[in-house]
Amino acid sequence: MSQSTATYINVIGAGLAGSEAAYQIAKRGIPVKLYEMRGVKATPQHKTTNFAELVCSNSFRGDSLTNAVGLLKEEMRRLDSIIMRNGEANRVPAGGAMAVDREGYAESVTAELENHPLIEVIRDEITEIPDDAITVIATGPLTSDALAEKIHALNGGDGFYFYDAAAPIIDKSTIDMSKVYLKSRYDKGEAAYLNCPMTKEEFMAFHEALTTAEEAPLNAFEKEKYFEGCMPIEVMAKRGIKTMLYGPMKPVGLEYPDDYTGPRDGEFKTPYAVVQLRQDNAAGSLYNIVGFQTHLKWGEQKRVFQTIPGLENAEFVRYGVMHRNSYMDSPNLLTETFQSRSNPNLFFAGQMTGVEGYVESAASGLVAGINAARLFKREEALIFPQTTAIGSLPHYVTHADSKHFQPMNVNFGIIKELEGPRIRDKKERYEAIASRALADLDTCLASL
C-alpha cells in the first residue's frame, strides 16, 4: 500500500493517547484532524466532554526513578509530553506518587489542543477506519460499537478483552475526621493520605460484608476476566481472607499517630488493616478510596463502605463502576512504532494496544504520534532503545507470545538488563537502569 498524499493526519479519539499523539504530530508542523465523539455521543463512564479525562483513579502512580513508571514519566517529560506537562501543572498532594486534579488537568489539556493552530477538533463519531490519510486510532477501551467492529475484524474476529473498574469518590466534609489520620506510607514525601484504621474485628466484619455483597451483573455470555492491576476489591477479597492485607489495605508503614485515641488491638503500634483515601481535586474537597475499584451495586457500595471507620456518614459523589476493555492482538498486528503491519498508514495507541495504565497509554500515543509524523515527512521510523522504558514497553506488547498476550504495565522486568555483574541491591540496580535509560534516551534524541 502506498503512503497517503493527504496534507494532514487523522487522530481518532482524544483520550490520553490520542491527545498526546495529536500534540506530538502538531508540534512537528503537521496539520491534525482530531476526532472526538464525546459531545455528540456519550460513553457509559465518561462524565465530561473534556479531552484526556481520567475515568478511573486520579493517580499517575509513583514518581521516583526507582519505580519504572516514574522513569517512564521522566522520559516523557524529556520528549515534551503534553500529558506530563499539564499533569505537573495540576498536581495534588499524594506523597511519593503523582496525582492530579482530574477536572483541572483535563480542562487544561483540552484548552491547549483546541487552541493549537494546527489542530482541527471535530466532534463526531467515526464508524469506519479512515483511508484518506495517515491515521492514529486511539479510541480507548470505550470504543464505540461501530468502530470496534472494524477493529475487531483486524483481530481476525478473536475477542481480546478484560474488565477494569473505578473506585468511589467521596465528599471530604462528610468524613469523620476524629477516626482517621493524615500520613503517607513510611512517611515518604508529604503527609498526603487520610488513613482509616481497622482492628482485626473491624476488618473481619468488613471482609464478610464485602464478600457477601451483591455485584452488578455482567453480560451472560462474557467471562469475568480482570486486569490484575485494576481488580475489583470484592474479587480480591474472595481470593482469601488476607489478600487485601497485602494489597490496598496493607497497614505496613502506616503506624498510628501518637495522639490516636480510637480503638486498636492491644498495644500494637500499627493497625490490623488500613483503608487509604487520596485527594482527588485541587480544592481538597473530594477524596477517592485508594485501590477500591468495584463492581458492586451502588446501594451495596454505600452499605459496605460506610462500615469503614470514619466513613459511616460519607456521601458518595461518584460510585465505583466497571467497564469492558477490548485490546488488540498487538504481537501479530503491530510493529514497535504501533504501526499496523498490514496497513502502514494506520497506527494505534492507548489501552487497545495492550498497554495498561494512564501513563503507559499516553506513552504509546507519544510513540505513535512521533512516528506518524515521521512517516508523513518520509523520515525513518524512530524506535526508542530497549534500555529505556518508552522503548521497552512497545517492544514488549508487539513481541509477546500472542497465545498468552495480556495487557502490561511498564516495569523493570521488560527493560533490557544491565551489562556486567548483577547489582544485588534492588534500589541500586533500579537506579542504574534509570541512569542508563535517561542517558540512552538523551543520546537517541541528540542524534535526530
Curated annotation (Swiss-Prot):
Molecular functions (GO terms): flavin adenine dinucleotide binding; tRNA (uracil(54)-C5)-methyltransferase activity, 5,10-methylenetetrahydrofolate-dependent
Cellular component aspect of the GO annotation: cytosol
Obligatory cofactor(s): FAD
Compartment list: Cytoplasm
Binding locations of FAD: 13-18
GO BP annotations listed: tRNA methylation; tRNA wobble uridine modification
Gene3D superfamilies: FAD/NAD(P)-binding domain
InterPro entries per the UniProt record, alphabetical: FAD/NAD-bd_sf, MnmG-rel, MnmG-rel_CS, MnmG_N, TrmFO
E.C. numbers: 2.1.1.74
Highest taxon listed in the record's lineage: Bacteria
Keywords: Cytoplasm, FAD, Flavoprotein, Methyltransferase, NAD, NADP, Transferase, tRNA processing
EC class of the enzyme, as a word: transferase
Reactions catalysed according to its record: uridine(54) in tRNA + (6R)-5,10-methylene-5,6,7,8-tetrahydrofolate + NADH + H(+) = 5-methyluridine(54) in tRNA + (6S)-5,6,7,8-tetrahydrofolate + NAD(+); uridine(54) in tRNA + (6R)-5,10-methylene-5,6,7,8-tetrahydrofolate + NADPH + H(+) = 5-methyluridine(54) in tRNA + (6S)-5,6,7,8-tetrahydrofolate + NADP(+)
Family in the record: Belongs to the MnmG family. TrmFO subfamily.
Function: Catalyzes the folate-dependent formation of 5-methyl-uridine at position 54 (M-5-U54) in all tRNAs.
Name of protein: Methylenetetrahydrofolate--tRNA-(uracil-5-)-methyltransferase TrmFO
Gene: trmFO
